[in-house]
Amino acid sequence: MPQPSRPRKGSMGFSPRSRAASEVPRFNSWPDDEGQPGLQGFAGYKAGMSHVVAINDEPNSPREGQEETVPVTVVETPPMRAVAVRAYEDTPYGKRPLTEVWTDEVHEDLERSLSVPEEQSGDIEGDIRTALDEGALADVRVITHTVPGALSSVPKKEPDVMETRVGGGSLSDRVDFALDLVDDGGEHTVTDVFRAGEYTDVAGITKGKGTQGPVKRWGVQKRKGKHARQGWRRRIGNLGPWNPSRVRSTVPQQGQTGYHQRTELNKRLIDLGDDDVSPDGGFVNYGEVDGPYALVKGSVPGPDKRLVRFRPAVRPGDQPRLDPEVRYVSTASNQG
């Protein structure tokens, strides 16, 4: 059998593999929600991994109704704050911000991240409702931020600011929900947005590995035999043909590895709670989880202490039952 061709591993769809512009991941699309108006996103800080014993509730599964061990990632999810409402309009170049309304009372640490508007001139809230009546309003989003200063395990006070879409109901209902949320102080929790058992999409910035060669970066084979004895075992054989006289972007070369934004689809929320979930001695490189948390089935991108964002799944498959039965959460220490 001939040797199959494998010039590299990995999708070219992720190229160029450069460092992420920000540690706060972004969502470029949002699901269409036909339920009640509400926020379509939340964020937390990755603490580490553990495992739980839960009842398999997947319909038509051979193990339905039986106990099984599930690996989970623990994400600490302290309450977030909504500080502004941003309205969008349709233009020939896509959606563009129309105007935004800021709350008068913001958290004291928010000025570490951005310059907070001191005062706003005119009736901006009235402008949003006027645009709604005229049919010029296309979408409503809320500017939210985390409060990492309230966590003992995240060594920073600078909030992470992000934009979250308001979904569900009519456009008028979404405007009312967003304005009421900001007027009421803007504080909201993960249980206000999600429910245990839902499928979510998780976005994060992966662990950075610096500059790496083509073997680690692209998974190419090391040279063998006489080619390796030339002195370069971990280099590629050539950069391409004489013509066209340029190096193509498909050639696997050394470069930045890791610290990329990645979004993983259909991650199930196993549990949302605030009970003791920390292992004996705390999570390695993180510490104790003192407040609300989310247990996500499987792994999520990024190292410990890094921000991860959630949104409702944009491509949900067959949704299992909500509120899965968790019988045991491991708090055993792996450090002895």
From Swiss-Prot:
GO terms for molecular function: rRNA binding; structural constituent of ribosome. The keyword Ribonucleoprotein applies. GO terms for cellular component: cytosolic large ribosomal subunit. Gene3D superfamilies: 3.30.1430.10, Ribosomal protein L3, domain 3, Translation factors. Residues 1-43, 205-230, 311-336 are annotated as: Disordered. GO terms for biological process: translation. Residues 219-230 have a biased composition (Basic residues). Keywords: Ribonucleoprotein, Ribosomal protein, RNA-binding, rRNA-binding. It comes from the Archaea. The keyword Ribonucleoprotein applies. One of the primary rRNA binding proteins, it binds directly near the 3'-end of the 23S rRNA, where it nucleates assembly of the 50S subunit. Part of the 50S ribosomal subunit. Forms a cluster with proteins L14 and L24e. Belongs to the universal ribosomal protein uL3 family. This is Large ribosomal subunit protein uL3.
